Amino acid sequence: MFKMPLIVAVVCALVGMGAHAGAACLDVRQSQPLTFKGSLSRPVFPGPPNYEDVKKGDKPERAYIIKLDAPICATGDEFLDSSQTFDTVQLLVDDSANDSRALNASLTQLIGKRVEVTGKSGFGAQTGHHHAPLLVTLVKIAAEGTGR
């Protein structure tokens, strides 16, 4: 008898936590800029043809990745699952933008450092060329605390 009310209470608590977690997820459809803080890296990932191992002949692909301080979840895209958390975001530079050269230079200088990032147009990973669960087009990047 005692076990049934306890099980019901635990299930209700878990359902409530799940609803709360979904409400707290980042919505990539929002019109506000997306902001993140974390450590910037530029690792090599295996690309075509097999996306498995550079040493076995796959083309090396480099990507700018920000490792977040804490995992997040995201919604607003068919390739994002609000029940999944992640702590990496791939940063993209729009090469047609006027400031693309400056952004690429800043990215290179800030590898290995803690950064503050502002982005737009977030979307979930869709292909083997996407190396984090969330990809964001970079608008601004600065060393953490400088606010440039």
Spans of features found by a protein language model:
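Bacterial N-terminal signal peptides that target proteins for export
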Residues: M1-V8
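OB-fold/S1-family single-stranded nucleic acid-binding modules
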Residues: A125-R148
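Structural detector for short beta-strands of small beta-barrel domains
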Residues: S31-A63, K67-A74
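Short boundary/loop segments of OB/S1/cold-shock single-stranded nucleic-acid-binding domains
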Residues: G22-Q32
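OB-fold and OB-like beta-barrel modules that bind single-stranded nucleic acids
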Residues: K37-L40, G112-S121
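Short nucleic-acid-contacting surface segments enriched for D/E, G, S/T with interspersed K/R
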Residues: S100-V117
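Bacterial N-terminal signal peptides
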Residues: V8-G16
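Beta-strand/loop nucleic-acid-binding surfaces
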Residues: D77-A105
